Design a protein with these regions (language model features):
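Short, acidic/polar
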Residues: 9-21, 81-91
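Extreme N-terminal starter segment of soluble prokaryotic enzymes
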Residues: 1-3
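Structural motif
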Residues: 22-23, 96
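Glycine-rich, proline-tolerant flexible connector loops at the mouths of alpha/beta enzymes
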Residues: 31-47, 109-111
Length: 195
């Protein structure tokens, strides 16, 4: 097992030289953040990210994440092109020593945290989720702390409507279709996928 730390790229408020100071730290878990979901991560962007890590003596073996486009999750006709792009991302990342890609297949919302600064009894802070706080939110006009507001309210409502009526079995079938499409690239590169 290797000790790694989440790093949100060059704009992260925690610089790599701080991460390197953590005893036993061997690498970072990061991603390319300036490419639209579904597009190919060009090798020059990956190389630049890896060079930043290398400069600080940190490995870049884990990527979290290469986002899965909603059209793939929904099983739309555009999914085959998007899956091909995802497979190319796997191949491109493999050229730079990446061994694991973390991803999710959750519809619309990657994650929910209702508080980015939950204060514990010892004074430490952490991210937290409260079901009670979540249930108070207007699901059609969500604004959560630290959330990437990728969608306008109209786009969000459209996506939610697209998922209306989708069964668990249909979503799972779309996940299997996606995995069947990307596994050849994983086999070629030796990259593991972590959901």
């Amino acid at each position: 097992m290797k000790l790694t730390f989440r790093w949100y790229g060059p704009k992260d408020c925690i610089p790599l030289n701080y991460i390197k100071q953590i005893p036993g730290m061997t690498g970072v878990v990061t991603a390319v953040y300036d490419v639209p979901v579904g597009e190919v991560w060009e090798c020059d962007k990956i190389a630049a990210l890896k060079a930043m890590c290398d400069k600080h003596g940190l490995e870049m073996e884990v990527i979290e994440s290469v986002p899965v486009h909603e059209d793939i999750k929904l099983g739309k006709p555009t999914r085959d092109r998007l899956i091909a792009n995802y497979a190319q991302n796997i191949r491109n990342l493999g050229k730079y020593g990446v061994k694991c890609i973390c991803y999710n297949f959750m519809p619309v919302f990657d994650w929910f945290r209702t508080n980015l600064y939950y204060k514990h009894a010892d004074g430490a802070t952490s991210l937290s989720y409260s079901e009670a706080d979540f249930n108070k939110l207007d699901k059609r006009n969500l604004r959560l702390p630290g959330w990437d507001e990728s969608y306008t309210p109209e786009q969000l409502n459209g996506l939610l409507a697209d998922y209306d009526g989708m069964t668990h079995e249909q979503l799972f079938g779309n996940l299997v279709y996606f995995l069947n499409g990307i596994m050849p690239a994983c086999d070629e590169t030796g990259i593991n996928m972590a959901i």
